[in-house]
């Protein structure tokens, strides 16, 4: 059994010991589904850490967004400094999928931007799963997408061992086949160089260099080096260098795959011709024939993922292998904020297939492209042997699956009570809100404000900034790493107020926040449903003076139930504190930034020398610009305009408005060329 060393400056308190014991018993007895129902701030993460430590299982902790995943990863790294805690999220900073719009006969090629630091962390996760059994991987929903074949990835690793004979030519050939490139001048991740009897490699999964020192044909030494100073960090007896990409296809399998693709193409062309779809048949034949030539000659082509089923040797309709398949058999799944995450699992497959269907029907892809997909919900759950759902508001599906196997946490170890909830009328709400913000700012406390629409959030941010409030606006187009920075800066006091739409609910650990404001609380819908209201109110549940302000003119059923549940928990907590002589105290949790320091950010805010708030709120200025005005733009205005256009392009791609995204992409390209010509 893996040995987890849980290190914490405190021991389980309140109802944590009971919850831990119940969950551990359930896992040891083989219970497939359990639920930890814990109010915000009751230490659910610490309870799960104790569960993992006591059961000794490799664990996958699934979060519904990248920000929450980063926060959880930080916490688990603090609890388990001697064990392997990994971070696995999508490595795309920007991703516009391949698409076709039949109405306008517009084809849009796939465009993307990969974050190299996150790619390194993904490789680090799979490497740890192969080499250790004390592994906790904190992941987003991206873990249900195809990730090569674990057995081939492991088999392809290039092995070095001190004292063994090494054929250097064979080793270099294997590195190239594993998609490492030779560069004798600049060595970074995914590259290697040879200098005399020394081979240096930049592994895909870490930022240290590996030096293999030879004496003749014998491996004399293996060392880790600092990539900047060249200082020797560690000496090793043996090492495996895993492929630079997760998708590894042996030569013999590639030949079989090429033939299978050719056979499928032949059958599909016959079908299209019989249907009288001559244009589609010609298009498909031309594209696929070119791809086959590229695969045969260099082993790769643009859009190679569309042939993943053939390259992996899978049958039609079979699920792809993903991160889950890299885990050993006795792994444990923890689904954080399960009421949101489980719904996401169900939605991913349908959205992917709708887009692929159009591409296949119009001759852009073979039918097998549909098998390059995320797991279906039922496929995912069939792979999960034991699951613990974690939420303050678990969904009906999770409760049904758990079948009464439930552990509840209401008591906070700090003695902090659930926030006071106050409903105020909407008339004069902005001025009232401004007064409340100033009170908190004087006490160096933080405020979260959630609105119903993006436009409303932008307008409110504008107004607060004009009234000298230190405010930021958190929106969906912000890169995942920058999003983590924004949360970090709020905690560190760089600003006092954070405004958002649906980004301020589940799981955010912000003990400095004393006030949560919910505008339009009486507008029934997803964002103002009972569970959403309870979650949003809970963002102030880590502060001794926590308070939630709901601006509304009516008391809806959702509001009434959310307020009643908050008051019920508050009464239980108050009674426990009185019985045990507990005085509420601040959480005192420091603002950890281990993910940020680990990543060596490729960029920070794009506002060097400018007012951050102004740049954040002027995105709508892009709407006033059309292509006829582009020629007259001043050069010094182009960098900011490019940033704003990129934001709009990403929003359009996210909303499946591919024509607008492609148009914006072309304008960005034109502006960049103009900058290059004139600088």
UniProtKB/Swiss-Prot annotation:
Kindly state the positions of the motif Beta-hairpin in this protein.
91-114
Question: Transmembrane region positions?
Answer: none
This protein's source sits in the domain of life called: Bacteria
UniProt-listed PROSITE patterns: HELICASE_ATP_BIND_1, HELICASE_CTER, UVR
Keyword Zinc-finger in annotation: no
| Single Gene Ontology MF annotation | ATP hydrolysis activity
PANTHER family, alphabetically?
UVRABC SYSTEM PROTEIN B
Its domain description in UniProt is: The beta-hairpin motif is involved in DNA binding.
Q: How is this protein organized at the quaternary level?
A: Forms a heterotetramer with UvrA during the search for lesions. Interacts with UvrC in an incision complex.
What does this gene product do? The UvrABC repair system catalyzes the recognition and processing of DNA lesions. A damage recognition complex composed of 2 UvrA and 2 UvrB subunits scans DNA for abnormalities. Upon binding of the UvrA(2)B(2) complex to a putative damaged site, the DNA wraps around one UvrB monomer. DNA wrap is dependent on ATP binding by UvrB and probably causes local melting of the DNA helix, facilitating insertion of UvrB beta-hairpin between the DNA strands. Then UvrB probes one DNA strand for the presence of a lesion.
Q: What is this protein called?
A: UvrABC system protein B
Lineage at the top is: Bacteria, Bacillati, Cyanobacteriota, Cyanophyceae, Synechococcales
Q: Which gene encodes it?
A: uvrB
């Amino acid at each position: 059994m893996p040995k987890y060393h849980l290190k914490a400056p405190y021991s389980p308190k309140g109802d944590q010991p009971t919850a831990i014991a119940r969950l551990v018993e359930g896992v040891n007895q083989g219970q497939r589904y359990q639920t930890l129902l814990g109010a915000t701030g009751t230490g659910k993460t610490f309870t799960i850490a104790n569960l993992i430590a006591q059961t000794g299982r490799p664990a996958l902790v699934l979060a519904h967004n990248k920000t929450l995943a980063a926060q959880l990863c930080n916490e688990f790294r603090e609890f388990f400094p001697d064990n392997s805690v990994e971070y696995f999220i999508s490595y795309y900073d920007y991703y516009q999928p391949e698409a076709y719009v039949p109405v306008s006969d517009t084809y849009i090629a796939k465009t993307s931007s990969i974050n190299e630091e996150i790619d390194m962390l993904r490789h680090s996760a799979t490497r740890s799963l192969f080499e250790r059994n004390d592994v906790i991987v904190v992941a987003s929903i991206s873990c249900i997408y195809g990730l090569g074949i674990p057995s081939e990835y492991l088999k392809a690793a290039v092995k070095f061992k001190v004292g063994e004979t090494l054929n250097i030519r064979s080793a270099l050939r294997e590195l190239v086949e594993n998609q490492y490139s030779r560069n004798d001048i600049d060595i970074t991740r995914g590259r290697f160089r040879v200098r005399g009897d020394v081979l240096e490699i930049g592994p895909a999964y870490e930022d240290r260099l590996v030096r293999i020192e030879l004496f003749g044909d014998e491996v004399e030494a293996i060392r880790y080096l600092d990539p900047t100073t060249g200082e020797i960090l560690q000496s090793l007896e043996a090492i495996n260098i895993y492929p630079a990409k997760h998708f590894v296809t042996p030569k013999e399998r590639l030949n079989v795959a090429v033939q299978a693709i050719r056979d499928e193409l032949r059958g599909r062309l016959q079908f299209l011709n019989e249907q009288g779809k001559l244009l589609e048949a010609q298009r498909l034949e031309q594209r696929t024939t070119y791809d086959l030539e590229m695969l045969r000659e260099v082993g790769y082509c643009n859009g190679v993922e569309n042939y993943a089923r053939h390259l992996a040797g899978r049958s039609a309709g079979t699920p792809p292998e993903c991160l889950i398949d890299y885990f050993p058999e006795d792994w444990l799944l923890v689904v954080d904020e399960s009421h949101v995450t489980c719904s996401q699992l169900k939605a991913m497959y349908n959205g992917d297939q709708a887009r692929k269907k159009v591409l296949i029907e119009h001759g852009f892809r073979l039918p097998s492209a549909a098998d390059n997909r995320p797991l279906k919900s039922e496929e995912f759950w069939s792979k999960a042997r034991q699951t613990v759902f974690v939420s303050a508001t678990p969904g009906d599906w999770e409760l049904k699956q758990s079948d009464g196997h439930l552990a509840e946490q209401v008591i906070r170890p700090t003695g902090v009570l659930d926030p006071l909830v106050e409903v105020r009328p909407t008339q004069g709400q902005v001025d009232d809100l401004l007064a409340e913000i100033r009170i908190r700012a004087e006490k160096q406390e933080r405020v979260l404000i959630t609105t119903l629409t993006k436009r409303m959030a932008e307008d409110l941010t504008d107004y607060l900034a004009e009234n000298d409030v230190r405010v930021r606006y958190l929106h969906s187009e912000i890169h995942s790493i920058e999003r983590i920075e924004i949360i970090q800066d709020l905690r560190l006091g760089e600003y006092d107020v954070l405004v958002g739409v649906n980004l301020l609910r589940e799981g955010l650990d912000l003990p400095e926040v004393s006030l949560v404001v919910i505008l339009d609380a009486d507008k029934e819908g997803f964002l103002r449903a009972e569970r959403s209201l309870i979650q949003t109110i809970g963002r102030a549940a880590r502060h001794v003076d926590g308070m939630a302000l709901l601006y509304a003119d009516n008391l809806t059923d959702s509001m009434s139930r959310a307020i009643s549940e908050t008051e019920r928990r508050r009464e239980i907590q108050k009674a426990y504190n009185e019985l045990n002589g507990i005085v509420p105290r601040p959480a005192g949790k420091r603002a950890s930034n281990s993910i940020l320091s680990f990543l060596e950010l490729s960029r920070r805010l794009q506002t060097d020398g400018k007012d951050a708030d102004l740049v954040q709120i002027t995105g709508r200025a892009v709407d006033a610009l059309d292509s006829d005005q582009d020629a007259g733009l001043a050069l010094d205005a182009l960098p900011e305009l490019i940033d704003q256009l990129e934001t709009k392009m990403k929003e359009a791609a996210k909303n499946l408005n591919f024509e607008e995204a492609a148009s914006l992409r072309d304008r960005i390209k034109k502006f960049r060329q103009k900058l290059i010509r004139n600088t």
